[in-house]
Regions:
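Arginine-glycine-rich low-complexity intrinsically disordered regions
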Residues: 177-196
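Conserved, hydrophobic alpha-helical core segments of structured domains
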Residues: 3-174
Length: 196
């Protein structure tokens, strides 16, 4: 595991400079927010080392995600109205500290809003999501969230499988998912540890 970005992040924090670049005031040691940001930094390093593409928009989305979650929490779930209203505000507040190029605003908000759609997995929605231009970034983001939240619901594994299988396999996965949900679908978003 390559950790150059994480080491730089930790050095900036130890020198007291990080708070001037990104607001980490209410992060406690070993909190979801810090684990998620660390996972994103390590992921970025691993992608660079493997000569895979990286975009600053993805990393900015990851660094700001804990702040968006904090602004959107409501009784153990996300308040969707707060979630969508907070997106622009979070980016605007970050711009007071560091520049976030306008071309990344839409990219960041797409990744964030796709997190809700990736969690829903109803009807024809998964097929539409697969064709979204930001699907791959949103999927990678979901895997990082799942890792940082220490979640074992298998949502990331489900999406991994859904990408691999052919059309009949996709239909079967959706059928199994539908059968596993008894009664009406509860619209609760976010991983438990992410929301605590």
């Amino acid at each position: 595991m390559y950790k150059r970005q994480l080491n730089n992040f930790n050095k900036l924090d130890s020198f007291g400079v990080l708070k001037y670049l990104i607001n980490t005031d209410n992060y406690v040691e070993n909190s979801f927010g810090l684990r998620f940001q660390h996972a994103a930094l390590i992921n970025t390093d691993n992608r660079l080392k493997a000569s895979k593409s990286v975009t600053p928009g993805f990393l900015i989305a990851a660094l700001l995600w804990p702040k968006l979650i904090d602004a959107s929490k409501d009784k153990g779930s996300l308040n969707l109205r707060k979630f969508f209203r907070s997106m622009d505000r979070i980016i605007r507040e970050q711009q007071v500290l560091t520049a976030v190029p306008r071309k990344f605003h839409g990219y960041i908000k797409d990744i964030w809003s796709l997190q809700l759609k990736l969690e829903t997995r109803l009807g024809h929605q998964p097929y539409k999501i697969l064709n979204h231009p930001r699907f791959r970034a949103a999927y990678d983001f979901l895997l990082l969230r799942e890792e940082a939240a220490r979640d074992s619901q298998g949502m990331g594994a489900w999406w991994t499988e859904f990408q691999k299988v052919n059309r009949p396999g996709k239909i079967e996965l959706l059928k199994l998912l539908r059968e596993s949900r008894s009664g009406p679908v509860e619209k609760k978003f976010g991983f438990l540890e992410e929301l605590s």
